[in-house]
Amino acid sequence: MKDFISIRDFDRAAIDRLIAEAERIDHHQYDPLEMKGKILALLFFEPSTRTRMSFEAAMARLGGTSLTLSSFEASSMAKGETLADTIRVVSGYVDAIVLRHPREGAARLASEVSSVPVINAGDGAGQHPSQTLLDLYTIRQSMPIDGINIGLLGDLRYGRTTHSLTYALSLYDAVIHTVAPAGLNLPSGLVHELRELGTEVIEHEQIEDVIKELDVLYVTRIQRERFPDTASYFNVASSYRITPELLRGTKEHMVVLHPLPRVDEIDPRVDKMKNARYFEQSHNGVPVRMAMLKQVIA
């Protein structure tokens, strides 16, 4: 595969191969000089900590070099240069590009003009395929993906991680339960598509209605940066919170995931519970992204 733009570009076999490669890497079965002499460009036009740094760490662990542009203002786009021209220029310097951009569809556009592979690190409310791969890898570490009941809680309208994850889950025998504040439900078109693909999607009003049925609880923050105004954001902020009390009586093996950053949707007391896997999930970004880089560059 030349590019990683959307999880829709993957079939189940491709996902399983990447997860297997990430597992080998996690067990130190890789060449630390495989990317020697290779250069990765990270173009991040939205804030990022985990995605940007884990790609940098992944490239470094494979022996390569990263060049990072971390703001619109620091690029010639601030002078009026188009994204397409920026990509054309940068692709002449490097062996692959990782792009994060606020506009949905920007990564696909970049892949069409780039002379090197492009990895989508998030395009607005669109897709985030590398996050989905590490989410699946984290689930697989605890249980088979087939047969799980997974609950998605939070901003499912603007949250690109859930958009990517739900489509990937449609490739497995998973039941998807959704709980969202008013107006932040999973887009109806996506729900319809998932059901057309044969995936059971069950919508709930409250997390309490379903939490004891879940094998995985995937929590997301309210995407403040996607809201048209501050008032709209504060109308739904702090409308849900995962606490130790809420998790009492859930399945013994149930895990809590979160793509991070969190705001106040998970009580810090949960961090020490055996259910909490979100920091492990974040750490899994390095081996998963190493596997991706090996595929697109090596």
From Swiss-Prot:
L-aspartate binds at K79, R160, R221. It catalyses: carbamoyl phosphate + L-aspartate = N-carbamoyl-L-aspartate + phosphate + H(+). Carbamoyl phosphate binds at R50, T51, R100, H128, Q131, L260, P261. One of its GO terms (molecular function) is amino acid binding. Pathway: Pyrimidine metabolism; UMP biosynthesis via de novo pathway; (S)-dihydroorotate from bicarbonate: step 2/3. InterPro entries: Asp/Orn_carbamoyltranf_P-bd (IPR006132), Asp/Orn_carbamoylTrfase (IPR006130), Asp/Orn_carbamoylTrfase_sf (IPR036901), Asp_carbamoyltransf (IPR002082), Asp_carbamoyltransf_Asp/Orn-bd (IPR006131). Disulfide bonds: none annotated. Its EC number is 2.1.3.2. Keywords: Pyrimidine biosynthesis, Transferase. It comes from the Archaea. GO terms for biological process: 'de novo' pyrimidine nucleobase biosynthetic process; 'de novo' UMP biosynthetic process; amino acid metabolic process. Transmembrane segments: none annotated. It is an enzyme of class 2 (transferase). Belongs to the aspartate/ornithine carbamoyltransferase superfamily. ATCase family. Catalyzes the condensation of carbamoyl phosphate and aspartate to form carbamoyl aspartate and inorganic phosphate, the committed step in the de novo pyrimidine nucleotide biosynthesis pathway. HAMAP family: Asp_carb_tr. Heterooligomer of catalytic and regulatory chains. This is Aspartate carbamoyltransferase catalytic subunit.
